[in-house]
Amino acid sequence: MSKPIQMERGVKYRDADKMALIPIKTVAVERQEILRKPSWMKIKLPADSTRIQGIKVAMRKNGLHSVCEEASCPNLAECFNHGTATFMILGAICTRRCPFCDVAHGRPVTPDANEPEKLAQTIADMGLRYVVVTSVDRDDLRDGGAQHFADCISAIRAKNPNIRIETLVPDFRGRMDRALEIINAAPPDVFNHNLENVPRLYRQVRPGADYHWSLKLLENFKVANPQLPTKSGLMVGLGETNAEIVDVMRDLCRHGVTMLTLGQYLQPSRHHLPVKRYVSPQEFDEMKQEALAMGFTHAACGPFVRSSYHADLQAKGIEVK
């Protein structure tokens, strides 16, 4: 499809259609050029998928979305089978068009005012004790969706008084002060915002985002809420070096971040950014030791680690790979 002159509201643009809208073009990779996955990247699917289907049905019934499905997470089967999911609020259409991400791009619809209550009830029905709430970027909203986050946090706590809530927020570009003012009034238990990759590759990997802005967002929340942990994550395998990853880790430490996730980037389709390298489990272990030596209190580093992968265990300091 050629580049649309005007995107239709509510239409999801994916793969080649989404990439056509990015200023820095990504050339589709031919099948023979795709790096072969090493043995440690093989996923064993669960024999029983009953619980997986149950969670999907609950999501559809309440009109909710999970980032697990929308972003094609490789851990979906494992997490759903254990009765956990990362809820994605504010719709399933992102105003950004990052070429590593499988979430659809487009003009999103008006946020569902009933979503906080539906989300809270679904979490109660699932009996969750720890929940991760994330969102698409909503550059079309004055507060970037911050009030919706706050409403969801309040609604979840009202129906689930003993729950712990982790939020994985967008960068609130151009509206950080207003967004944090709203979120600080009803803060989560863990505040997460991913840097995703190293600053040298930002223009290609995160078009529309700013490395230093993201660091400032994490720092400003920490200053306002010194008792609460802040968290960030990176993908490896996009062309960065291990030395650059270590430099980012140092930047995060300097900005008060205490929880870190590092995981292998996987290409969602041949139209997305290609995998440049597969990082070995041994290298991930070395990065973890480096992170802990720097002062991180929690560091989950491994090929299948994602920001919200076993987030409840990460928060307890239990090793996750």
From Swiss-Prot:
* Binding locations of [4Fe-4S] cluster 2: C94, C98, C101
Question: Taxonomically, which superkingdom?
Answer: Bacteria
InterPro entries, per the entry: Aldolase_TIM (IPR013785), Elp3/MiaA/NifB-like_rSAM (IPR006638), LIAS_N (IPR031691), Lipoyl_synth (IPR003698), rSAM (IPR007197)
A GO cellular component annotation in the UniProt record: cytoplasm
Question: What is its pathway?
Answer: Protein modification; protein lipoylation via endogenous pathway; protein N(6)-(lipoyl)lysine from octanoyl-[acyl-carrier-protein]: step 2/2
Per UniProt, the keywords (alphabetical) are: 4Fe-4S, Cytoplasm, Iron, Iron-sulfur, Metal-binding, S-adenosyl-L-methionine, Transferase
Reaction(s) the record says it catalyses: [[Fe-S] cluster scaffold protein carrying a second [4Fe-4S](2+) cluster] + N(6)-octanoyl-L-lysyl-[protein] + 2 oxidized [2Fe-2S]-[ferredoxin] + 2 S-adenosyl-L-methionine + 4 H(+) = [[Fe-S] cluster scaffold protein] + N(6)-[(R)-dihydrolipoyl]-L-lysyl-[protein] + 4 Fe(3+) + 2 hydrogen sulfide + 2 5'-deoxyadenosine + 2 L-methionine + 2 reduced [2Fe-2S]-[ferredoxin]
What Enzyme Commission number(s) apply to this enzyme? 2.8.1.8
Q: Which residues bind [4Fe-4S] cluster 1?
A: C68, C73, C79, S308
The record's Pfam families line, in alphabetical order, gives: LIAS_N, Radical_SAM
Question: Is the keyword Chloroplast assigned to this protein?
Answer: no
Q: What is this protein called?
A: Lipoyl synthase
Q: Which organism is it from?
A: Sodalis glossinidius (strain morsitans)
